[in-house]
């Protein structure tokens, strides 16, 4: 029994100011008394003395007090039997409050001895606090809770130890937790978990390592709930992944308090054959035994499989880290967090989360979560995300798809039959991707499908999917089906034979075999034959019957692949020959009579077949002749009816398209669809009765021109010496070609395509007429033109009809016109008197010329031209066109300027004295008429000198270089002759009126005015614009060649609309369109459909109206200036663009947005066409003067200003136009919309590309014009903005 007074006295001595040694001695004496007593007496006095000694600066006294605390703390909570619990609780609380902080501070001491004493003291303090608080965590007094000693100790340790300022104190405090847990098995760690996890992120490495080791030690043997809390806390605090994975690997990999079965990591695979689940179970230490049936399913000899790695191998190859699960709820939470990522379609925002989800599920398999919590729970959670896995398999991102495919493969290997709820969806999806474009994905999917078939028990679905794959057209799918068939038979045929035979399995197998062994692909065929012999090993009878039912060739190939232990001779049955009955064979063989009888029967049968063929051919020929005669009669009847109709309407002037005319400058022929010639000089004086241009069109291909230019560069040894100057060039034009039109590309005088065609016709006509045609030709060479009789056109038409193909006459489409060169009017077959004594015959050089040989022309047959789109030749139109042309040439005299220019170059010395026999050359073709009637050089020279006093124009040079076919008329006055030429040219070049050529155009315009126009109306108007176009090139030629007064029409922007005024009449194409206000009414009608919003019609009609307006701008642009409608056109386009841009920014339906974009693109095209044709200076001023809305800036800059600026000179743009446009460009560059900024940058980039060719430092000058030059007085914000903008512009300038 301890003396309380003695204890109290010793405590007082310790607190007094006596010497340190005496205080230390008193402390030791106090410790001896308490140990001898076995319990604490006067606890308040002792606690106060310990606190004073511990705070003393003397190290000996403080160290002695630290050594005293463990003894005192171990005795303070036990007390005497008479002490109440409340008294003991008070004593412990007081001790912890008094010395707790002081002892924790000693943990940071430099001496290990002191730190060790402090750790011992803290452990005893913690034990005392836990012991006294284990039964009563809280006590209530007057409704108020009091903090327990354990709570005080935990708070002190957390705030002063784990959260201390010194790293050593934090390290020692966290290392103290495992000791506390070891001394007290149920010591609560949860209150300190958050602070301990935070120490994993501490800046000091020793603290981080101490926290890691503490967590591993504390939670290795903790309950699953505690481990789940640790995992959540690690994720919540965003601990470094490597650190967290290492801790979880140690914690979750160790057995918990609720689990005793060890979890081992899977070993690496040791085989390359398809791995079954039994091998994985054994490798993971599972208790399940290996089924013997799986072991019997080893591959047969000679059968190979693709390499199928194990689940752990594929995961290790992809760098998959284990994902540990602490509890069932943690597993459910893991799968639940993935589900939102698989909703909707794959996008840039969710594909990465999907890939991480696939990796996480693979990590679960690596960590063995499916074995830890049971396959049933794991598969149930997997079923919830199965649809997302299928989406990932079908992804176009290769990494995501490969992760998903490997996941399914590993699931099949790890789960086996437990994967049954998910097998059907997985297998159907994987087999269906065998024909995927990416071979890597296709091969991986088939490996995964094979893994399912190997590791999951047999089900009829396997054979059904394989049979469906065999029926696919894709080769890869059929090859994969054959491989799967081998896999299924190798794996399941032995131990699942009854399952295979049920549900029609044998029938499906036979179908697959029969289909596969005869497959066209070698790989699928070979694999199917291997599968057949596996099938034969288990179902020999069915396999033998199947083999004998195959074709002999296939049966032989299948038998060649038989294994060595199979006797194919006993399997394959010898098929008897299918004869009608038994044949009795003579001993000496067949008799001679029998052989002769067989030969005679065979000969008779052959003759009978030939006779039938001849009869059929004759009947077909008669049918064709009858059809040709009927067609000829019908054509003649229609011709008479049309002729009568034309005679009744002789007062109406039709637009004429000559047969061999075109406004194209080229040297070849090509068919044209629905287009007509519309040059100003396209109508002769006698061509009023010809049919419209839509009946026949022949244009000249520029490609052929290049070929002929190459051909004429070859020397022509057989050609005669030309009588004209070497620089003379002629062009291929129609019979009514004006004398002042000159092609931009000169052509060789000997290679006119018109003459080539006429020459081919002439040769065929001469060959068919025989000597009569030769006599006629001789007469033509010696008789003056005025004395010749007019030709008989009826015989010509019949001769032409005989050479025409009548196939497909009934299938002719009026909308598709294709010309045949042999069906043109044959002016060379007979002579015609046109009233002026000039020869209109067109001829071409002989085919022995080198140029014709290079072109590959065949003059022995009619010169056909390919039909466009496979259409038949329009025979009726050609006949009527030729008849009208002949009648017109007979009735109307042709002026000199309209004669057809000869294409033959002949020596002048021989031309006038050519004998009659020379009309036929060595090739059998007639000599060109020009060689028989060419004048002498003196005559030609006199004609040139007399006809032109001043410098001749281009057309005059062409005429002067062309040899005339009659003697010059020296008695005619030169002035009078020139005046007659101009009058004839004006009469022949009067442009055809669209209103007269197409009288129904007024009906179309009225439909526009009434709002009843349909798509056909707009299509016809667009075609009308193309047919009667006004070429800017022709306008320039007319302006150059015409000597009369030039009149400029109104037009503020273009300044190119003009007409030629002569005697009060306009001969240009402008006047033809202005007749009756045609163009103005057409434009007014179009505006009704161009309106954006209400009144504009449907979107389809509005787009059709845009097309017509675009064609008007392209083909009749000068009319807008002539009618003062150019400003109105610009206003309509700009207003429509403004309205459409404003509508696009508002909230409208998606269909309206698409329609609005299409309409906006149409108006931008019209604006771009206007910008490319108007005068750039005037057009820029007009466009800049319009008030532009903010929404339409992009469209106007892109389609309006850019085409105008790039057409201007560089210096003018930099000095004048770009500074005027600078405010608009600068505001657009600073706009918030990226589209507008990019548009402005694009405009400046185009300008820089144009300007830097002619100007140095183009970008500097552009920046100066825009006001972007950096000045000294710029403030900081403005300087920063300018620099950023200059950097962007320089970047785009330097890209090109």
Curated annotation (Swiss-Prot):
SMART domains listed in its UniProt record: TOG
Entry's Gene Ontology BP terms: cell division; mitotic spindle assembly
Biased composition annotated in UniProt, kind: Polar residues: 277-287, 953-964
Keywords attached to this entry: Cell cycle, Cell division, Coiled coil, Cytoplasm, Cytoskeleton, Microtubule, Mitosis, Nucleus
Cell compartments where the protein resides: Cytoplasm, Cytoskeleton; Nucleus; Cytoplasm, Cytoskeleton, Spindle
InterPro entries, alphabetized: ARM-like, ARM-type_fold, CLASP_N_dom, TOG
GO MF terms held by the record: microtubule binding
GO annotations of cellular component type: cytoplasmic microtubule; microtubule organizing center; mitotic spindle; mitotic spindle midzone; nucleus; spindle microtubule
Keyword set includes ATP-binding: no
Region (Disordered): 258-287, 735-793, 888-946, 953-972
Family membership: Belongs to the CLASP family.
Record's protein name: Protein STU1
Lineage: Eukaryota, Fungi, Dikarya, Basidiomycota, Ustilaginomycotina
């Amino acid at each position: 029994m301890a003396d309380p007074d003695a204890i109290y006295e010793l405590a007082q001595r310790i607190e007094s100011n006596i010497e340190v040694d005496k205080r230390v001695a008193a402390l030791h004496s106090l410790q001896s008394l308490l140990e001898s007593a076995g319990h604490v007496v006067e606890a308040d006095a002792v606690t106060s003395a310990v606190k004073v000694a511990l705070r003393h600066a003397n190290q000996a006294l403080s160290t002695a007090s630290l050594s005293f605390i463990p003894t005192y703390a171990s005795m303070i909570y036990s007390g005497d039997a008479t002490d109440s619990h409340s008294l003991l609780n008070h004593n412990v609380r007081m001790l912890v409050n008094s010395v707790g902080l002081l002892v924790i501070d000693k943990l940071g001491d430099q001496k290990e001895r002191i730190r060790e004493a402090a750790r011992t003291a803290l452990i005893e303090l913690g034990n005392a606090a836990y012991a006294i608080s284990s039964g009563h965590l809280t006590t209530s007094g007057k409704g108020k809770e009091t903090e327990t000693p354990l709570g005080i100790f935990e708070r002190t340790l957390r705030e002063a130890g784990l959260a201390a300022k010194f790293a050593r104190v934090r390290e020692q405090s966290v290392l103290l937790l495992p000791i506390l847990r070891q001394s007290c098995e149920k010591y609560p760690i949860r209150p300190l978990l958050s602070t301990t996890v935070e120490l994993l992120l501490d800046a000091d490495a020793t603290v981080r390592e101490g926290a890691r080791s503490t967590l591993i030690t504390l939670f290795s043997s903790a309950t699953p709930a505690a481990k789940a809390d640790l995992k959540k806390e690690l994720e919540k605090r965003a601990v470094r992944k490597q650190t967290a994975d290492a801790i979880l690997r140690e914690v979750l990999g160790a057995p918990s308090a609720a689990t005793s079965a060890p979890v081992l990591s899977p070993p690496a695979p040791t085989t390359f054959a398809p791995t079954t689940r039994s091998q994985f179970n054994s490798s993971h230490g599972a208790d399940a035994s290996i089924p013997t049936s799986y072991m019997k399913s080893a591959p047969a000899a000679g059968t190979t499989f693709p390499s199928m790695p194990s689940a752990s191998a594929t995961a290790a190859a992809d760098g998959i880290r284990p994902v540990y699960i602490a509890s069932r709820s943690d597993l459910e939470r893991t799968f639940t967090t993935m589900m939102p990522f698989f909703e909707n379609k794959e996008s840039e925002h969710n594909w990465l989360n999907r890939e991480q989800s696939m990796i996480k599920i693979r990590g679960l398999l690596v960590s063995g979560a499916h074995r830890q919590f049971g396959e049933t729970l794991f598969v149930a959670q997997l079923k919830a995300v199965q649809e997302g896995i299928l989406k990932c398999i079908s992804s176009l991102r290769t990494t995501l798809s490969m992760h998903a495919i490997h996941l399914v493969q590993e699931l099949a290997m790890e789960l086996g039959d437990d994967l049954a709820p998910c097998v059907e969806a997985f297998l159907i999806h994987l087999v269906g991707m065998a024909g995927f474009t990416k071979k890597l994905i296709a091969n991986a999917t088939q490996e995964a499908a094979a893994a399912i078939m190997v590791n999951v028990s047999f089900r009829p679905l396997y054979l059904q999917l394989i049979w469906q794959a065999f029926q696919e057209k894709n080769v890869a799918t059929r090859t994969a089906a054959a491989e799967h068939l081998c896999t299924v038979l190798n794996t399941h045929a032995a131990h699942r034979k009854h399952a295979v035979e049920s549900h029609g399995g044998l029938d499906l197998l036979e179908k697959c075999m029969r289909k596969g062994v005869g497959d066209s692909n070698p790989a699928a065929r070979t694999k199917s034959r291997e599968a057949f012999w596996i099938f034969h090993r288990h179902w020999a009878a069915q396999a033998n019957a199947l083999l004998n039912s195959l074709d002999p060739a296939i049966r032989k190939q299948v038998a060649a692949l038989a294994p060595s232990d199979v006797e194919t001779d006993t399997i394959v049955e010898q098929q008897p020959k299918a004869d009608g009955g038994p044949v009795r064979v003579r001993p000496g063989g067949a008799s001679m009579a029998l052989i002769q009888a067989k030969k005679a029967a065979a000969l008779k049968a052959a003759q009978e077949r030939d006779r039938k063929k001849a009869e059929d051919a004759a009947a077909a020929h008669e049918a064709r002749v009858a059809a040709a005669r009927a067609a000829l009669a019908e054509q003649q009847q229609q011709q008479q009816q049309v002729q009568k109709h034309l005679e009744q309407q002789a007062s109406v002037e039709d637009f004429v398209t000559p047969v061999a005319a075109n406004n194209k400058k080229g040297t070849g022929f090509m068919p044209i669809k629905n287009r007509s010639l519309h040059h100003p000089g396209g109508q002769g004086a006698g061509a009023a009765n010809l049919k419209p241009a839509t009946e026949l069109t022949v244009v000249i291909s520029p490609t052929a021109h290049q070929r002929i230019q190459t051909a004429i560069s070859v020397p022509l040894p057989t050609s005669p010496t030309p009588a004209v100057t070497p620089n003379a060039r002629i062009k291929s034009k129609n019979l009514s070609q004006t004398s002042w039109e000159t092609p931009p590309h000169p052509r060789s005088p000997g290679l006119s395509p018109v003459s080539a065609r006429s020459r081919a016709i002439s040769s065929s006509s001469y060959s068919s007429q025989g000597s009569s045609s030769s006599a006629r030709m001789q007469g033509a060479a010696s008789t003056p033109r005025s004395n010749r009789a007019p030709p008989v056109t009826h015989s010509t038409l019949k001769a032409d009809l005989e050479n025409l193909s009548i196939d497909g006459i009934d299938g002719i489409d009026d909308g598709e016109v294709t010309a045949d060169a042999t069906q043109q009017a044959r002016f060379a077959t007979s002579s015609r008197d046109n009233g002026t004594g000039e020869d209109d015959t067109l001829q071409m050089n002989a085919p022995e010329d080198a140029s014709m040989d290079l072109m590959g022309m065949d003059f022995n047959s009619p010169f056909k031209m390919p039909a466009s789109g496979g259409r038949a030749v329009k025979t009726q139109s050609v006949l009527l066109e030729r008849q009208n042309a002949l009648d017109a040439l007979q009735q109307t005299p042709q002026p000199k300027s309209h004669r057809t220019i000869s294409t033959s170059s002949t020596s002048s010395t021989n031309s006038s004295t050519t004998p009659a026999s020379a009309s036929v050359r060595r090739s059998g073709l007639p000599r060109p008429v020009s060689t028989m009637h060419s004048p002498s050089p003196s005559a030609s020279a006199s004609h040139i000198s007399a006809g032109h006093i001043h410098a001749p124009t281009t057309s005059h040079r062409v005429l002067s270089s062309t040899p005339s076919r009659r003697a010059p008329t020296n008695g005619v006055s030169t002035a009078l002759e020139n005046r007659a030429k101009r009058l004839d040219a004006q009469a022949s070049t009067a442009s055809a009126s669209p209103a007269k050529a197409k009288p129904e155009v007024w009906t179309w315009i009225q439909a526009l005015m009434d709002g009843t126009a349909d798509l056909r109306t707009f299509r016809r108007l667009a075609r009308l614009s193309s047919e009667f176009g006004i070429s800017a090139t022709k306008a320039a030629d007319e302006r150059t060649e015409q000597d009369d007064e030039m009149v400029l029409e109104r037009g503020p922007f273009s300044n190119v609309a003009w007409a030629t005024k002569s005697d009060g009449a306009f001969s240009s194409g402008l006047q033809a369109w202005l007749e009756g206000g045609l163009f103005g009414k057409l434009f007014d009608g179009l505006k009704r459909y161009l309106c954006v919003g209400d009144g504009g019609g449907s979107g389809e009609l509005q787009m059709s109206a845009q097309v017509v307006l675009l064609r008007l701008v392209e083909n009749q642009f000068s009319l807008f200036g002539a009618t003062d409608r150019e400003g109105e056109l610009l206003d309509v386009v700009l207003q429509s663009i403004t309205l459409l841009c404003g509508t696009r920014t508002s909230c409208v339906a998606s269909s309206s947005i698409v329609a609005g974009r299409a309409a906006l693109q149409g108006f931008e095209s019209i604006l771009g066409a206007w910008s490319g044709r108007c005068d750039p200076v005037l057009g820029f001023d007009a466009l800049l003067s319009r008030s532009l809305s903010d929404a339409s800036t992009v469209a106007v800059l892109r389609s309006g200003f850019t085409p105008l600026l790039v057409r201007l000179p560089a210096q003018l743009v930099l000095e004048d136009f770009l500074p005027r446009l600078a405010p608009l460009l600068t505001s657009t560059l600073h706009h918030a919309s990226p589209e507008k900024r990019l548009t402005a940058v694009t405009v400046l980039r185009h300008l820089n590309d144009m300007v830097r060719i002619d100007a140095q430092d183009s970008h500097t000058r552009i920046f100066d014009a825009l006001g972007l030059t950096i000045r000294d007085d710029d403030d900081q914000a403005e300087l920063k903005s300018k620099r950023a903008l200059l950097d962007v512009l320089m970047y785009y300038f330097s890209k090109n």
